[in-house]
Amino acid sequence: MDTIRKADSRRGRIAYEVAGLAWLAEASDPGAAVVPVLDHGATWLEEPRLASVSPTSRVAEEFGRALAHTHAAGASHLGAPPPGFEGDGWMGEAPLSLPERPRARGIAEVGQGGPRPDHARPGERATASSRGDSWGAFYACERIAPYVGDRTFTAAERALIEKLCERLESGTLDHGQPRLVEEAKSRQSNIGAARTHGDLWSGNVMWTPGGAVLIDPAAQGGHAEGDLAALAVFGCPHYERILAAYNEASPLGDGWRERIALHQMHIIMIHCAVFGRSYVPEAMAIARRYV
């Protein structure tokens, strides 16, 4: 078997990926297929080398339906880490908070240039009162505010992001999960969020002769619409067929298409923090749309 070996000496990086792949793989029947980990150590992992082919619309539809079932496998709460992993994770080169519960903090940090990825505090654990914490508050405080810094955004740009975060925290932009996730939440008291890949841009879906395979996750409890939105950030083959099949298997809430850009704000903010101002106009366009 032809294999690939990934190495990363930074603490916790490999452990997070291995735990995330295993967690997603638990749902791979009937959920989406996941690349297997053949072997791993503290600073490396080995996977089979996957052959790549051009996807057909049929395979894309199969992936959409399977992804709906992966999400419905559930997670305990928004931001939940994969079982067996403790601490914060990463999304590409950016630190990613994985709180025990969403932090009980306000958005004032945004206007003050909240912690940038290079100022993150891994190991700082967060708590809150219940699994019913709102998506908007979580998204504002954990997925937008940490990536605002005075070296990337102007004062006016930070103020606009703060307005978006205020609206998110108010709850006016909250919305339910797709039907299968909501049904899982109603059946099981230990499920409060979707089980998400967390970094599902199109490059992290391998189209193989046997179908779509997920790779390189930032696995976490999240909102299912976040994965669907991420697929569109850089374009995805047969995207509309994926969405249609997903929506057939697990109907999305009213207005889901109008929320795609909102769910893309996280990945765009990370790109601003990591790559600089070239992504700022896109972040500003999203913020203006939803304030």
Where are these regions (language model features)?
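Hydrophobic, aromatic-enriched interface-forming segments
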Residues: 123-178, 191
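A mid-sequence, solvent-exposed acidic-amphipathic segment
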Residues: 158-184, 188-214
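Active-site Asp-x-Gly
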Residues: 128-140, 192-195, 202, 206-258, ...
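ATP/Mg2+ or Mg2+-diphosphate-binding catalytic cores
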Residues: 271-291
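Alpha-helical elements of Rossmann-like donor-binding domains used by nucleotide-donor carbohydrate transfer enzymes
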Residues: 16-23, 62-69, 163, 167, ...
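A general structural signal marking secondary-structure boundaries and capping sites
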Residues: 25-28, 71-78, 151, 172, ...
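Hydrophobic alpha-helical segments that form the core
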Residues: 261-269
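ATP-binding pocket architecture of kinase catalytic cores
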Residues: 2-134, 141, 184-187
